[in-house]
């Protein structure tokens, strides 16, 4: 009995520690990308906190002194604050693209191209477990980082949304204030992994992963529930103008210049926006669509890996 127990103990220990060892291997192989991601999250969070504190204080003083109209004409502190407010959104979007590139190239295709993955499969690590670790480890850091950024961004919007000139603008900023911000880079990860498994060459996988995510990004920006067009009168910040005949034209930039307004026959202005009541239905549906696409990409990746492994 004692001999049997001694024989069973190492096997049990191997089963317990092998997943941890695989996680450590993924972290070690891609520690450079991990440090870049942590630096991005820390830097973007710091910038958001600056906007939440000192930046907002300066903008509020300028707004109290000059008002919206004066700040726009003078390009004052509140106008600059309104522009800076959107920078983190741009950074988050670029990060999703970068994640797709990383997943397609260094994470998957490079290891398949060099034979590192095949070597791991011969050393008691099944292809399925290898792919699970490749997906789970980056996904965990992506979820933690984007949840933090989304929480701080929402706090910033709740506290100082009044400092944005003419209110909230780009659709992408609305997107960055909710759970879809977490789902988008996960989709980038899944698409990159799928492309990497299909191509198995680093440079082509990089290019195709970026192109695949670009297609998703372009579609997301122009189809319901991802995009809606609503008209609302605005002051000083206008995206479209209407003539007395009802024709819609590009804003000529007249502001309050009556001669300019008369020259272009402009009688009113509108801009595109998403009303608050429409936010959560769209946000949750968008998140669901992105997560569904992520699940499909992951399922296809595992199916492709099984077929490749069976074919040898």
Question: What are these regions, as identified by a protein language model?
Answer:
Residues 32-68, 91-101, 208-219:
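Hydrophobic alpha-helical transmembrane segments of multi-pass membrane transport/permease proteins
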Residues 102-123, 135:
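Transmembrane helix boundary and interhelical loop/hinge segments in multi-pass membrane proteins
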Residues 207-255:
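Aromatic-rich transmembrane-lumenal/periplasmic boundary elements in polytopic membrane proteins
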Residues 88-112, 187-203, 287-308:
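Transmembrane alpha-helical segments in integral membrane proteins
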Residues 17-44, 128-139, 200-210:
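Alpha-helical transmembrane segments and their helix-start/interface "positive-inside/aromatic belt" motifs
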Residues 57-104, 269-289:
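Membrane-embedded or membrane-proximal helical elements that form or frame transporter/channel pores
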Residues 2-12, 31-41, 235-238, 242-308, ...:
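Alpha-helical transmembrane segments of multi-pass membrane transporters/translocases
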Residues 6-11, 42, 46-50, 86-89, ...:
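Secretory targeting signals
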